[in-house]
């Protein structure tokens, strides 16, 4: 009887060990899983649940919204390509996110810091076509995926949705976009109740070519004003374009009731002395809302920034003040 009991105990132990050996102890969606996705280069295998993402595609805000683990980013200032934008500074500090260049190519060096990227030992690199020249070098460091990119940043929703597809987070993306659209609709209704169908134009004093201006339509602040807040474009605002570079004489074509005007210091400067500026309807009525170039460049093109800047633009109108 004793021998039989010992034999049974032995068999139980053998089967238990065999079961443990045959069981996959890696949880579903673990860091060791990979998924094949389609990007601008074709098909590529990437981690399904990456733990050390280096983003040089300008998608850090979207990745953080999706609670992805970003260790380094190129979401730096569109002006100097080095400093962290004000609305991201706390997040970067809290999460220890390193800076490795600028996603738009605006860095003063013109390049990504490949050496630093390699030192960080990422398990995934997300890039855009602006850095295509270093694709092979990035791919040698870690699996590298290239987001579909229209260069002009108008397709920010499409890029966000592509991230959701890659990482099985489509529902989270759709929820964020629905909340964003609801907020935009609420602000648009408040503005409409106050000013009705009065018209708008969005100008930027060009920081590079002195004496010229951007007039926006579908890009950045133009998208926020016309497409999200549903405000009416003035006569003279171009259609079906990101924006256009114009000179001061173009002001004579604008018949806007309200103007957003962005410049490096947030004032009209020498533009305010021009007769053609003084003759515009919005200027005469005192309906000019001034904003700072760096702020709108850093906030009006990516998800978190858009949500914040949308409210800033709306508040400028509702409070009849500047974009602050």
Regions found by a protein language model. Name each.
Residues 59-116:
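A short, structured surface patch at a secondary-structure boundary
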């Amino acid at each position: 009887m004793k021998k039989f009991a010992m034999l049974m105990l032995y068999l139980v132990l053998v089967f238990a060990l065999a079961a443990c050996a045959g069981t996959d102890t890696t949880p579903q969606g673990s860091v060791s899983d990979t998924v094949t996705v389609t990007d601008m280069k074709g098909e590529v295998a990437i981690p399904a649940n990456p733990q050390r993402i280096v983003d040089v595609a300008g998608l850090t805000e979207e990745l953080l919204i999706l609670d992805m683990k970003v260790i380094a980013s190129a979401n730096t200032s569109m002006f100097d390509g080095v400093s962290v934008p004000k609305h991201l500074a706390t997040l970067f500090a809290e999460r220890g996110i390193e800076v490795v260049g600028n996603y738009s190519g605006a860095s003063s060096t013109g390049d990504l810091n490949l050496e630093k990227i390699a030192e960080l030992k990422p398990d995934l690199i997300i890039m855009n076509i602006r850095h295509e020249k270093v694709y092979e070098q990035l791919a040698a460091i870690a699996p590298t995926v290239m987001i579909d990119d229209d260069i002009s940043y108008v397709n920010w929703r499409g890029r966000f949705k592509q991230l959701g597809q890659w990482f099985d987070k489509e529902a989270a993306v759709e929820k964020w976009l629905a909340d964003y659209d609801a907020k935009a609709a609420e602000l648009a209704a408040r503005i409409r109740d106050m000013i009705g169908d009065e018209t708008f134009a969005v100008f930027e004093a060009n920081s590079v070519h002195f004496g010229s201006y951007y007039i926006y339509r579908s890009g950045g602040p133009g998208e926020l004003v016309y497409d999200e807040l549903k405000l009416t474009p003035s006569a003279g605002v171009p259609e079906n374009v990101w924006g256009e570079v114009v000179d001061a004489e173009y002001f004579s074509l604008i018949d806007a009731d309200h103007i957003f005007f962005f410049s490096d210091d947030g004032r009209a400067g020498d533009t305010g002395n021009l007769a053609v500026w003084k003759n515009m309807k919005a200027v005469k009525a005192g309906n000019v809302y001034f904003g700072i170039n760096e702020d709108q460049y850093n906030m009006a093109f990516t998800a978190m920034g858009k949500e914040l800047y949308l409210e800033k633009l709306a508040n400028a109108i509702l409070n009849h003040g500047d974009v602050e």
